[in-house]
Amino acid sequence: MTEQIELIKLYSTRILALAAQMPHVGSLDNPDASAMKRSPLCGSKVAVDVIMQNGKITEFAQNVKACALGQAAASVAAQNIIGRTAQEVARARDELAAMLKSGGPPPGPPFDGFEVLAPASEYKNR
């Protein structure tokens, strides 16, 4: 029963709401860069396209095939990525990895919404 309660906490109302409201879904016609990643643990797949101007992301699109946690993460990223530099995005990525893998603090603004994923650190396959 305790494990079930923990799983319910993991898939909180906030995570489910973020997953349901994912912005920038689709693809761009002429992106400056594209990337696709697949998780070997769970099979989630994320493909992104970006257009950059003057060193900042001006357009962003994503196709996400993932569980609610992956969709919530994609939602937080997409809500905050326009206007950011590649360095800001890389810093948020590194801070998120540290939070999930070694108990570090959540990423700083504007990506502080990733804090909602902190409970996932207890579930290595997530």
Label each region the model flagged:
Residues 1-26, 84-126:
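C-terminal binding/interaction regions
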Residues 35, 59-66, 115-125:
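A short glycine/serine-rich beta->alpha loop
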